[in-house]
C-alpha cells in the first residue's frame, strides 16, 4: 500500500501558529502549546497511511468537495485526499468548541461561488 504525501496548506499553518500563540501567550502555557502542536502534527502524520478512514463532512458544499474531518483532542482537522497524486491536503485546524459551521462557511465561501 502506497503512503500519501501530506501537504499542510498555508491556512492550516496559520491555524497552528494562532493556536500556538493563544496557548503560549494568552493562556501563559508555552509547554502545553508545544505538546498540543506536536500531538496535532503526529495525528496529521498518521494520515499518510489511511486518510479515508475519516468520514466526509455530511454538509454541503464540503461533502461534494471531498472535505474530511479528523479529531485531534479538542481540535478538528479538515482535509481532502487528492488520489491522482496520492496527496492529503490539510486545509484547516479549528478548536472544536468554536462555531465550526460558521467558520467553515467563512473560510470556504468561494466554494459556493464557484458552482
Regions found by a protein language model. Give the residues of each.
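Basic, Lys/Arg-enriched alpha-helical interface segments
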Residues: 1-64, 109-115
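Enriched for short, Lys/Arg-rich terminal
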Residues: 27, 72-76, 80-115
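Basic side chains
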Residues: 43, 53, 68-69, 92, ...
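Basic/aromatic recognition patch in beta-strand/loop cores that engages polyanionic ligands
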Residues: 50-87
